[in-house]
Amino acid sequence: MAMTEQQKFKVLADQIKISNQLDAEILNSGELTRIDVSNKNRTWEFHITLPQFLAHEDYLLFINAIEQEFKDIANVTCRFTVTNGTNQDEHAIKYFGHCIDQTALSPKVKGQLKQKKLIMSGKVLKVMVSNDIERNHFDKACNGSLIKAFRNCGFDIDKIIFETNDNDQEQNLASLEAHIQEEDEQSARLATEKLEKMKAEKAKQQDNNESAVDKCQIGKPIQIENIKPIESIIEEEFKVAIEGVIFDINLKELKSGRHIVEIKVTDYTDSLVLKMFTRKNKDDLEHFKALSVGKWVRAQGRIEEDTFIRDLVMMMSDIEEIKKATKKDKAEEKRVEFHLHTAMSQMDGIPNIGAYVKQAADWGHPAIAVTDHNVVQAFPDAHAAAEKHGIKMIYGMEGMLVDDGVPIAYKPQDVVLKDATYVVFDVETTGLSNQYDKIIELAAVKVHNGEIIDKFERFSNPHERLSETIINLTHITDDMLVDAPEIEEVLTEFKEWVGDAIFVAHNASFDMGFIDTGYERLGFGPSTNGVIDTLELSRTINTEYGKHGLNFLAKKYGVELTQHHRAIYDTEATAYIFIKMVQQMKELGVLNHNEINKKLSNEDAYKRARPSHVTLIVQNQQGLKNLFKIVSASLVKYFYRTPRIPRSLLDEYREGLLVGTACDEGELFTAVMQKDQSQVEKIAKYYDFIEIQPPALYQDLIDRELIRDTETLHEIYQRLIHAGDTAGIPVIATGNAHYLFEHDGIARKILIASQPGNPLNRSTLPEAHFRTTDEMLNEFHFLGEEKAHEIVVKNTNELADRIERVVPIKDELYTPRMEGANEEIRELSYANARKLYGEDLPQIVIDRLEKELKSIIGNGFAVIYLISQRLVKKSLDDGYLVGSRGSVGSSFVATMTEITEVNPLPPHYICPNCKTSEFFNDGSVGSGFDLPDKTCETCGAPLIKEGQDIPFETFLGFKGDKVPDIDLNFSGEYQPNAHNYTKVLFGEDKVFRAGTIGTVAEKTAFGYVKGYLNDQGIHKRGAEIDRLVKGCTGVKRTTGQHPGGIIVVPDYMDIYDFTPIQYPADDQNSAWMTTHFDFHSIHDNVLKLDILGHDDPTMIRMLQDLSGIDPKTIPVDDKEVMQIFSTPESLGVTEDEILCKTGTFGVPEFGTGFVRQMLEDTKPTTFSELVQISGLSHGTDVWLGNAQELIKTGICDLSSVIGCRDDIMVYLMYAGLEPSMAFKIMESVRKGKGLTEEMIETMKENEVPDWYLDSCLKIKYMFPKAHAAAYVLMAVRIAYFKVHHPLYYYASYFTIRASDFDLITMIKDKTSIRNTVKDMYSRYMDLGKKEKDVLTVLEIMNEMAHRGYRMQPISLEKSQAFEFIIEGDTLIPPFISVPGLGENVAKRIVEARDDGPFLSKEDLNKKAGLSQKIIEYLDELGSLPNLPDKAQLSIFDM
């Protein structure tokens, strides 16, 4: 008997295992009507009829299940028919995102489209878009495919319409009013519900309700024996169990109200994405919320291919949080780590210092040190972490120690160089250590009177097999040495042959080390012969060379080097080079061996020295300041490829510091390899403690054959310990940690691999994790239990006890002193107030001044105001306006001292003649600029209109004790002058640029990870790549400087009381030094001036120069200017011509597409409304989903929504709230913290409307009104020129603000330009950044063209280098506007033109250096009319 269609559907549901997931009615009534099969295309299309829509999550589950079931047979699609689609409008919204995913749009555009609002009307689906550009693009790109996707899901849809919000005609006035009332009621309900919810939560906390979920447990318990490593998961599987630690978690609410959690976990073999939907009628959400990064979970589920991320994921059925045993330090007595590197060790250390400090505290360590490479930038965070975790912080650094001058000549002899006999020699050895390795070849030539007069060449038998490395390097084999004499015989013969000649060698310290060691073992004692090192000699007399290797010098001196790294050949080449060097020394006046070091020494000698690592530990507060001085000098005065610390510098500032021997690259470790024990002990006495590090860290030295074997390494340890015991210096075991745990080491490998020139790339990196006491004791077990305990535990604790508590950061603000600052600010404030308001000041002016001056002077801030006043005055005197940023415009004292143009008093009139004033204190007027024009009733003069109604509290806090942050916008071209003026005010050694630290960003880290995996031939899934990226992110990469921040050190202190100093990015040619600490670390300790560069003041200056109009005289309420914010009519153009409903293209703050849309929505007509828009556009969750909806629905208008942070305080005070509560509410809302229960109750008591409370609850960040007002003031002035002086405006705009030009289009007629703009709008979603920048310029050009003005081509005769110039009704572009033509070339063209006309294109190329591509562009532009390719020579030129 044949199955019915309903039975077929049930069988299908059972087969794909979702029967228990479907609603009973759907399961029983669903029908599988047919299956269309195409064997050719391997496709099956299931046609399914359902009585109602599947819930969206169930639909996705169904689709996923059916695709998985038949994936090996065919590509499956489904087409649904829904018989009862009465609620399809509700489901369309939920299915919208899925249907978008079925289109061919790019992921970015899909994401934008998913944010749009849907309205379903019958069989028509309306998608509300922001503007015409989006409407045209979406309609063209996806209309058909989107309809198909909806129909396949069962929707009965005829068409989809993309509409802008302005075309929404669905509501008539009556329904609008009803909707407004409904919104009011809904807002009231929301606020009440919020209040009740808060009360309930508070009560819940008080009752300590035990039902709250604090540990995730969903589904069945998972058997531990079923757990498998994540790395073993390589294909889809039905049921798998894993466990891992969470390193990323994302909990997302779906439109259905259900949630999906996406977790990324790792077990350090690999990583995996885990997903799970919340189940119906379960408390899964609360369990998900209990999860967080760092927690371990055990999970079980199905492994499947996720089609979106194209990777394997686990769809979890069960998950449980587990306790994972953490690494413990089980030793009874804990050690102290004295050597570790944080993320501030550039591209080398991994964790921040806080992670180390927490781990040390968890292990019970009494103290911990930080010793980053060459820097101390972790100190501020180290201090904070130590205070938090209650552990002693030891501050230090691993630096690069160099001898002040590396000698060229050793053991000076009174011998005339031209008469001397020289033995130029070279040794080949079994390794680099003269203490543990042996000479296998000794070769020399004797030189006299500039000629080689004798030769010496001997092999010696080392009685050991040569390594492959040595054989490959020297081409000497074991067979060549079998019958060679003993080294004793060779050296005895050699000593006799040398006589009293002067030794010469390239890198003589190496070769002489082997000779002297050999002589001493034979009982001869060290050589007494004079020595000359040709390597150091070349570095001194050939400073222009970047290299000084024998190969390089042989080429430079024209000497043949037959076979490098064979002693006899190296020796002969060195001899001929040296003969020429003797002549160079003669020319430099060096005639005697004992004159070489003296006459050839120079202040750059530190550059020649080979740096040794040294550990510097701060013992007390004096030591901290001395370390700051050492760090500064190494970064500023002695930087050469790396920061260097001359020994004399360390000696000068050694007080308060403990000096340690550091790692295998330290001076003492090298001495053990190269010198006898007496010399080692002599060197050891320079240090305060000796470090030895775990053998595991030195395995690389054995692998590279720098140390023979483990036994030799152990002997080196014994010699170091013996040196310490003999000298009475503590020997401590240090870990040289670069990361926390073993599994973190991969991140360091990736970072090191990203640096091709890093010497660490040459070898396998050792395990450099933060070791426990147990691990360290185990590393040194070969020393015996007692000795291991002494160096690991006893000595490290005793050394830590010798160190005092040190605080690297000050705990208060230290401002500069300026004599009479308090009196000057008071006098200046009152003097200017009387100029404006008259001798008999209004009480409101006196009250505001006294209120502010009490806070400013009482808290020591007068000097900050006075400094700002001086800077602004200097700029104004030099002809450049200054715009204020931030909240400084909230201060009336700042207004009266001319720091800002924003007047924060309530709106008011002032008579410029008789000084009569009238204030509006009731909140009825938003800005004084919006007051109607009025004449003085006393004298008839036109009244000045002022006042923005901004409370002082938004600047210095309610108590007036917050450190003022005065940000000033200087002209970009004047900014360097303002910076330099601070040196005049305070002295060059008291001002520094605010330093910044640049770390590895996520995108950069991703590139490092991918590069490393590709180089290693390793494939990792996306989740593991994400984990590795996180491990590399945040590591210091470089340093920089704040764009405008200047740090001012008070005259009674110096910079080293606060921070070391350096050049940004170690650029020794930089004009300014910066703070070594990131300026945020010392923000509360020293004054920071924000002297920023901005285009607006520069543009105002150019407009003033062109027009002769003083910008301060421009009316702020010009009606035609105000009109452009809602229509382009006052520009003499139509919306259709310029493709825009406003006239604000190119107006600062109001020219972007986002703000233009706001203008279209709000149609502002007043200055205060423009300030509102500025605030709304800069805030977060202030406009979108908040004020925008309130205005659209008519609940309130633009003037009454919350736009700027100050509006809240002013509004609430007018509503009757106490100023302190109004301030608290403003601060809470602007920081995104919402409202407390007390705040809500107080607002309700004062009849604040519910919509206002609801709006406050949504806001995440708010803009200060003073900042907005300053920006709008500048914008209105520039708009004035746009309306009334168009060509001045366009010339200034293109010169100052535009960056990318399409001159080919710009010189065309207005119709062509408009068509180009329209075409770019249609392709907007696909435009790159550069094309979008070009579009911005073309929008302005289109507007200019439709106003009757034209752009000429570049003119070889008239164009300037950088400025657009006006000629009649046209503009002539500058050379810099040509794509690809740089500043230097632009200058060169003008300079070459001044020398005479260009005769040909060839002449243009030669004189101005223009490339052929640029010349072709100028030709196409029509800029080279009648200019021949080459100059034609006529008879008359002869």
UniProtKB/Swiss-Prot annotation:
It catalyses: DNA(n) + a 2'-deoxyribonucleoside 5'-triphosphate = DNA(n+1) + diphosphate. It is found in: Cytoplasm. GO terms for molecular function: 3'-5' exonuclease activity; DNA binding; DNA-directed DNA polymerase activity. GO terms for biological process: DNA-templated DNA replication. Residues 422-578 form the Exonuclease domain. Pfam families: DNA_pol3_a_NI, DNA_pol3_a_NII, DNA_pol3_alpha, DNA_pol3_finger, HHH_6, PHP, RNase_T. Keywords: Cytoplasm, DNA replication, DNA-directed DNA polymerase, Exonuclease, Hydrolase, Nuclease, Nucleotidyltransferase, Transferase. GO terms for cellular component: cytoplasm. SUPFAM superfamilies: PsbU/PolX domain-like (SSF81585), Ribonuclease H-like (SSF53098). Its EC number is 2.7.7.7. CDD domains: DEDDh, PHP_PolIIIA_POLC, polC_OBF. Required for replicative DNA synthesis. This DNA polymerase also exhibits 3' to 5' exonuclease activity. Belongs to the DNA polymerase type-C family. PolC subfamily. This is DNA polymerase III PolC-type. It comes from Staphylococcus aureus (strain Newman). The lineage of its organism: Bacteria, Bacillati, Bacillota, Bacilli, Bacillales.
